[in-house]
Each structure stands twice: as C-alpha cells, then as structure tokens.
Design a protein with these regions (language model features):
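C-terminal catalytic core of tyrosine-transesterase DNA break-rejoin enzymes
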Residues: 65, 83, 129, 133-136, ...
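N-terminal DNA-binding module of tyrosine recombinases/phage integrases
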Residues: 1-49, 202-207, 211, 290
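Conserved tyrosine-mediated DNA breakage-rejoining catalytic core shared by Y-recombinases
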Residues: 107, 143-201
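Basic, Lys/Arg- and aromatic-enriched nucleic-acid-binding interface segment
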Residues: 64, 68, 83-144, 152, ...
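Active-site/catalytic core of tyrosine-dependent DNA strand-transfer enzymes
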Residues: 192-243
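DNA/chromatin major-groove-contacting recognition/catalytic segments
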Residues: 116, 168-172, 262, 283, ...
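N-terminal DNA-binding recognition helix of tyrosine site-specific recombinases/integrases
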Residues: 33, 41-56, 60-93, 137-139
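Catalytic-site neighborhood detector that most strongly recognizes the C-terminal catalytic loop/helix
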Residues: 5, 17, 162, 273-298
Length: 304
C-alpha cells in the first residue's frame, strides 16, 4: 500500500469532471476548509478521530447542508485515494448534523428585516427583501432581470444563476451567468401583495429600465457582486441586532420555516425553493413539519 502522500498533494492530483458551478464549490471547500485543517496530514493520518474534530469545527460556523456537503466531498476524496492504492481511513463520520435554530431568523427578526427593507429603494436592499420573501438563493437573486418581474400576472420568473465560477485554466473566479443546475430550479414564484407593491415602486424608481437590465444593478447598470449584498446584509443585521448565527443564506431557511408554520405543503415548498426533489425538502425541513404536526395534534386534542 502507498503511504507517502499528503492530502494536499492528493488534492493537487485530482481532475474535476463536474459542472463549473460545482467545481467552484469544491475548490472553495478545499481552499477554505479542507486544506487548512487536514492538508498537511498524510492520508493514513486522517483518522476517524481527526475527521470528527474536523466536523466539529465545521459545525461551529457553517450551515448544516454545507457541513454535509464538505464531509461528503472529503469522503469521496478518500475513497478515490483508496482505489488508487493509498492507505486511508474510510470510516468517515456521519454527515448528518443537528438542525440549529439559531441560524434561522425567528418571527420577530423576520418581521424587523421586512419592515426595514420594504420601503427602501436601494437595489441591495431589494435583493435582501427578495431572498427573504421568496426563498431565492443569492445567485438566483443576482441572476434576475427586469423582464423576470411580471407585475400583471403577479409572478417572478427564475431563469438564471449568477455567481463566481472557478476557471482551472486561469485559476481565477470570474463572474458568470448560467442556467440553474437542475430543471426544477427554473421556476415561477407567485408574488404576494406586499412584495408586488415593493417591486412596483422599485421599478418605477428605476425609470422605465431596459427589460434585459439586471434587476439588482448598480448605477452603471451592472449586476452587483454577491459579496456586496452579503456585506449589506451584515450591516443591516448589526443595525437590527440580529443573532450572530444568522447569515444571508439563513433568509432562505427563514422563508421555508415561515411557509411551513403557515400551513404550506412540503410539495409546494419544494417547488418554490427549486429543490431537486420533495425528499430533499423533507430531509432539510422535516423538523418544522414534525413541529407543525404536533401543533395540529394539540388542536385536535381539544375535541376529546
């Protein structure tokens, strides 16, 4: 068995055969999380104990799904190494992690955000409002164009995803716009009255913009970078005194949680979020469904 190789070296030998957006994600996992914590170790030294410590560190600051994805990617890397004849520990820790409510804005935080942003005419504020009101991913918010807002039909069309994609030829992350990963990510979301009204005022303030213009654009008409919206969200979060664990992506979870609390079906929620399957939605938000069932049973109990 081969033993004289570190994870850092092994990562450098990998040839990615995945879509650009996924490649960007994997490279980010390597650079930000895997290399700093495990990269210096030989493959045989990455024991189950070391992996559990790695998982514990990830859980301190990342969303549950991100932790699962990073651990799953690490497991894939180790399995590939074993297939090549290297000595590795394949007893990786379970990828399931506990749901942490601290990551999701509660009702009062959600309401405070809405009241703060609803009447703002700043594009970055509209981007945040859209994320929390529709469950859109950050890249989907930035991929919206003026033509995607249909006020007559009260519908928002999601057709593109804008994000930085890793380019292995230049080792850079240029911003690119592409269609979403799956067909179900291309979707139409009904606009509730409050959001429709906010969008109508926002578009009016833009002054009859070109239909192809990015909806969330700067004064030069170019779409904002994701980091700009994230910085703005951090500023708003600090101003409103939201909990430290709340992130921009938490807005998507907040939308889903509020929807389930108000009686939305898991199937409808799955379509609104653009998930690949209802099973994935149930696996992600099953805790909220269980809590909703408990509340319904308490109502039924009053009949006995």
């Amino acid at each position: 068995m081969k033993t004289d190789i570190t994870l850092e070296t092994w990562l450098g030998e990998q040839e990615a055969d995945v879509k650009g957006s996924s490649l960007k994600t994997y490279k980010s996992y390597e650079r930000v999380h895997i290399r700093p914590f495990l990269g210096h170790l030989y493959l045989a030294e990455i024991t189950a104990k070391k992996q559990r410590a790695f998982k514990k560190q990830l859980c301190e600051s990342l969303a549950d799904k991100t932790v699962r994805d990073i651990l799953s990617y690490l497991r894939t890397l180790l399995k590939r190494a074993k297939q090549k004849g290297y000595t590795v520990c394949i007893k990786t820790p379970k990828t399931a992690v506990e749901w942490r409510e601290k990551e999701v804005p509660d009702f009062q935080e959600h309401k405070a955000l809405s009241e703060k942003l609803r009447y703002s005419q700043k594009p970055v504020d509209m981007g945040i409002l859209l994320a929390m009101s529709t469950g859109l991913r950050l890249g989907e918010v930035l991929g919206l164009r003026v033509k995607d807002v249909d006020l007559r039909a009260s519908v928002l069309h999601v057709r593109a995803n804008r994000q930085r994609i890793y380019d292995p030829k230049t080792n850079t992350y240029p911003v690119r716009e592409q269609t979403p990963k799956t067909q179900k990510s291309c979707r139409s979301i009904p606009l509730h009255p409050a959001l429709k009204n906010a969008l109508a005022h926002y578009l009016k303030n833009m002054g009859n913009p070109d239909k192809e213009k990015p909806l969330i654009a700067n004064r030069q008409g170019r779409a904002y970078d994701a980091r700009t919206l994230q910085r703005r969200f951090q500023a708003v979060k600090k101003e409103l005194g939201l909990r430290p664990g709340v992130t921009f992506h938490s807005l998507r979870h907040s939308f889903a949680t509020r929807a389930l609390e108000l009686g939305a079906s898991i199937h409808t929620l799955s379509e609104l979020l653009g998930h690949s399957s209802v099973a994935f939605t149930l696996n992600t938000y099953g805790h909220s469904v269980t809590e909703q069932k408990r509340l319904e049973m308490e109502k039924i109990a009053k009949c006995f």
